[in-house]
């Protein structure tokens, strides 16, 4: 069986695409990219997908072979190069993490049925591929609490287990897969569950000047790691709506801070005696490269220390790129760290 320790995300291909076109889907990721990933030393990829790739709102329950072919070919490439594949639904019927405020998934039984039916179909399709593929239920749930999420999650697990009793299922907590929310997940008696979290701490370093974050754009500072945030008092004084940022004043950005922020996940595992996986982590590409390398070095060392697998965000583009358009790494040192190659 393949390993799921050192992975990389394929965001932007069949999820979060800028244009829904055959040309994009045929060219954004090819076999050569999977070969590049394998040669670098990674052992798996995380493949986000959006449901419109495989199901149209006009033909519910009819699954599109042309869209499914992209998952199929990625799986075949992964098998060829001995990589694992985590199949992650990024955009579900009625839910997308970017638009969670307008979500209908958790209140609409029809959307919930569609959601579970898609996974039921995929479980049947890939029932003989469990040595290479794992399913991740849904990316970055944001709900007032975990009640409705737990209910849907248990329905999903029940549906999958009626088809396949040993497929690995990756389950994340509320609030963008926060480590702090793992403890609020429903108890699951299943030996083939992996608990998934995301890690982008400290946020105003990993997301500095991120164009999609109002607060990061407002702060608009270059942040180094290790280091400290600069000008917090002045910023809050001039922008009182961000008063919550005063807690960042004089905060030391270093490995011990990362360890502290990772602690809820470690404590959860100690209590549950379960497997952990970090489905996303990373630093925005506009950050200082030396700082970017050092953050990843520190974080990977913690994942190694605590024996946690994970997948960096992101292989290319998506503002967090590890490789450029020519499949050249932004830094070979960074790739070696991420692939957990000892140098």
UniProtKB/Swiss-Prot annotation:
Gene for this chain: celC
Protein known as: Endoglucanase C
Catalytic activity: Endohydrolysis of (1->4)-beta-D-glucosidic linkages in cellulose, lichenin and cereal beta-D-glucans
Name of the top EC class for this enzyme: hydrolase
Keyword Hydrolase: yes
Active-site feature positions: 140, 280
Source organism phylogeny: Bacteria, Bacillati, Bacillota, Clostridia, Eubacteriales
Annotated GO biological process: cellulose catabolic process
Pathway terms, separated by semicolons: Glycan metabolism; cellulose degradation
Family: Belongs to the glycosyl hydrolase 5 (cellulase A) family.
Function recorded in the entry: This enzyme catalyzes the endohydrolysis of 1,4-beta-glucosidic linkages in cellulose, lichenin and cereal beta-D-glucans.
Entry's Gene Ontology cellular component terms: cell surface; extracellular region
Keyword field: Carbohydrate metabolism, Cellulose degradation, Glycosidase, Hydrolase, Polysaccharide degradation
Pfam families, per database record: Cellulase
Note: CelC has an unusual substrate range and displays features common to cellobiohydrolases by being able to cleave the agluconic bond of aryl-beta-glucosides.
InterPro entries for this protein: Glyco_hydro_5, Glyco_hydro_5_CS, Glycoside_hydrolase_SF, Glycosyl_hydrolase_5
The EC number(s) this enzyme carries: 3.2.1.4
Molecular functions (GO terms): beta-glucosidase activity; cellulase activity
PROSITE patterns cross-referenced by the UniProt entry: GLYCOSYL_HYDROL_F5 (PS00659)
């Amino acid at each position: 069986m393949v390993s799921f320790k050192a992975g990389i995300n394929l965001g932007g291909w069949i999820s979060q695409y800028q244009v829904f076109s055959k040309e994009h889907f045929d060219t954004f990721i090819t076999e050569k990219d999977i070969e590049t990933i394998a040669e670098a030393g990674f052992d798996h990829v995380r493949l986000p997908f959006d449901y419109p790739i495989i199901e149209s709102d006009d033909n519910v329950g009819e699954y599109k072979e042309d869209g499914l072919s992209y998952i199929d070919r990625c799986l075949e490439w992964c098998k060829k190069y001995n990589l694992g594949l985590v199949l992650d639904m990024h955009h579900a019927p009625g839910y997308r993490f970017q638009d969670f405020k307008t979500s209908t998934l958790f209140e609409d039984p029809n959307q919930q049925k569609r959601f579970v039916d898609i996974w039921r179909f995929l479980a049947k399709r890939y029932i003989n591929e469990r040595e290479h593929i794992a399913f991740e239920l849904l990316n970055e749930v944001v709900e007032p609490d975990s009640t409705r999420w737990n209910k849907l999650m248990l329905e999903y697990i029940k549906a999958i287990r009626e088809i396949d009793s040993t497929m690995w299922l990756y389950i994340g907590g509320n609030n963008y897969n926060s480590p702090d929310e793992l403890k609020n997940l429903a108890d699951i008696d299943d030996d083939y569950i992996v608990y998934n979290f995301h890690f982008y701490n400290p946020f105003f370093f990993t997301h500095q000047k991120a164009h999609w974050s109002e607060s990061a754009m407002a702060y608009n500072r270059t942040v180094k790691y290790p280091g400290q945030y600069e000008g917090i008092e002045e910023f809050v004084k001039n922008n009182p709506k961000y008063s919550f940022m005063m807690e960042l004043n004089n905060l030391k950005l270093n490995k011990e801070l990362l360890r502290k922020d990772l602690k809820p996940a470690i404590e959860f595992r100690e209590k549950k005696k379960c497997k952990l996986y970090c489905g996303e982590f990373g630093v925005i590409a506009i950050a200082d490269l030396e700082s970017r390398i050092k953050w990843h070095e520190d974080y990977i060392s913690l994942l190694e220390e605590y024996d946690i697998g994970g997948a960096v965000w992101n292989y290319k583009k998506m503002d967090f790129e590890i490789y450029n358009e020519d499949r050249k790494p932004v830094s070979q040192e960074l790739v070696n760290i991420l692939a957990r190659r000892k140098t």
